[in-house]
Design a protein with these regions (language model features):
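Feature captures the catalytic ectodomains and active-site-proximal regions of enzymes
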Residues: 1-138
Length: 138
């Protein structure tokens, strides 16, 4: 980020996914803390560079560690909704209820690139958010 050599960086922090399959809550907490630290460093660098990012996940896992019916570790992926978080200098409003296939079109739009017709997803940005001064004037 600090070098400015790249227009886009896409990374996957797999820590909570990998540890979530073990069913060990202490390991999942440590993994989540490590990811939190890493994302914090990325966001700090983005702020210094004037960049923006999306933070999301492709599925849940570590939020459900125990099968409540059996009491055994729950080691599969979940289908729980995951957040889509925008970090940057602009205020943006995103549509709720998007799908994984909507992430790439949204990212392309943020980069000023056209969405290929082969992509079935949609852009999740619905409008620029109003700041407080705009809301007061409305």
């Amino acid at each position: 980020i600090e070098s400015g050599d790249y227009d886009v960086i896409i990374c996957n922090y797999a820590n909570t996914d990998m540890v979530g399959h073990t069913g060990k809550i202490e390991a999942a907490i440590a993994a989540a803390e490590a990811v939190d630290e890493c994302i914090g460093r990325v966001i700090s660098a983005l702020h210094r560079a004037g960049g923006e990012c999306l933070v999301t996940a492709d599925h849940g896992n570590a939020e459900k560690m125990v099968n409540h019916a059996s009491g055994q570790p729950y080691t599969a992926h979940t289908t729980n909704p995951v957040p889509l978080i925008y970090v940057g200098t602009q205020k943006k409003v995103f549509e709720e209820g998007g799908a994984l296939c909507d992430i790439a079109p949204t990212l392309l739009m943020m980069m000023g690139l056209e969405q290929p017709t082969e992509m079935s997803g949609k852009v999740l940005l619905v409008e620029p958010a109003l700041d407080e001064a705009d809301e007061d004037a409305a």
